[in-house]
């Protein structure tokens, strides 16, 4: 069927057997759990992509995803479509305030010269750039040299490409304080601004599937920031991911999660941080 004729048709209905097949594929490859209640979301997302490439049905599209290098490229595109990347700068203000207070203490009371942060599930970059703005603003309060580095990871290659570009619409910048907009962004074209190079240089973007955390090179991280990612996973997998993230913390390091994203989870080497409207843990230092 010619691709141009698809636009006149409704969403392709998916059988229960097909749904289970696609559900298993997504969970096995990404850990994402598509519940039966979200079947229509999956149908719509797949149908739109199938129309774009002229694929006739779900079975043919599934086979395409299994076909070598071309399938891997198409898989990267599909994952980008299925992961909701609606994010914003300073999305949860209390969590960013907590990070700044914690890092201030490291610089001020512990005499630290360098702090490492990790943004897990960074999407199109708003989260790590928010962390970078906070850190850059913080270090100017201290005499002498203070440094920081941010690693930002995501499964979506298209999202990472946008993050590396660092170009955002003015609408996206509405939540950014005016002083930060003036200091950390420069206009590039009408209605769009770009992160200034000196801030962009503090963030390293890399692809990472959280199912592969066991092989991730990050170690002894001072701050792990992971919000609006765990909502995609089943409870047992959430716990597994958080446990592996905690393994990457330096002694005394802090992990910041989305409020309400994890329940009934604890580790003896972590203690809950008491900070209003946040969910965070400190890794105890050896006695």
Label every PLM stretch briefly.
Residues 251-259:
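Conserved beta-strand signature within the Rossmann-like core of class I S-adenosyl-L-methionine
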């Amino acid at each position: 069927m010619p691709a141009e004729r698809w636009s006149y048709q409704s969403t392709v209905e998916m059988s229960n057997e097909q749904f289970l097949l696609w559900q298993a594929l997504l969970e096995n490859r990404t850990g994402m759990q598509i519940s039966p209640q979200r079947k229509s979301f999956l149908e719509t997302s797949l149908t739109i992509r199938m129309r774009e490439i002229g694929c006739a049905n779900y079975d043919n599209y599934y086979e395409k995803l299994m076909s070598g290098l071309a399938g891997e490229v198409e898989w990267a595109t599909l994952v980008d479509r299925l992961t909701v990347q609606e994010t914003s700068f300073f999305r949860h203000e209390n969590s960013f305030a907590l990070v700044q207070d914690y890092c201030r203490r490291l610089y001020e009371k512990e005499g630290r010269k360098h702090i490492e942060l990790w943004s897990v599930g960074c999407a199109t970059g708003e989260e790590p750039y928010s962390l970078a703005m906070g850190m850059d603003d913080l270090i100017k309060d201290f005499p002498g040299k203070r440094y920081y580095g941010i690693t930002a990871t995501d499964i979506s290659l298209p999202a990472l490409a946008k993050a590396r570009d660092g170009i955002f619409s003015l609408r996206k910048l509405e939540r950014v304080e005016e002083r930060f907009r003036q200091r950390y962004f420069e206009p590039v074209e009408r209605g769009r601004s770009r992160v200034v190079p000196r801030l962009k240089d503090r963030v390293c973007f890399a692809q990472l599937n959280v199912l592969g955390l066991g092989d991730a090179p990050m170690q002894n991280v001072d701050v792990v920031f992971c919000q609006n990612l765990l909502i995609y996973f089943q409870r047992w997998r959430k716990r597994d991911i958080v446990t592996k993230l905690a393994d990457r913390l330096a002694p005394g390091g802090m992990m910041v999660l989305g409020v309400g994203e994890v329940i009934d989870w604890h580790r003896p080497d972590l203690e809950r941080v008491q900070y209003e409207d946040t969910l965070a843990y400190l890794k105890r230092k050896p006695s």
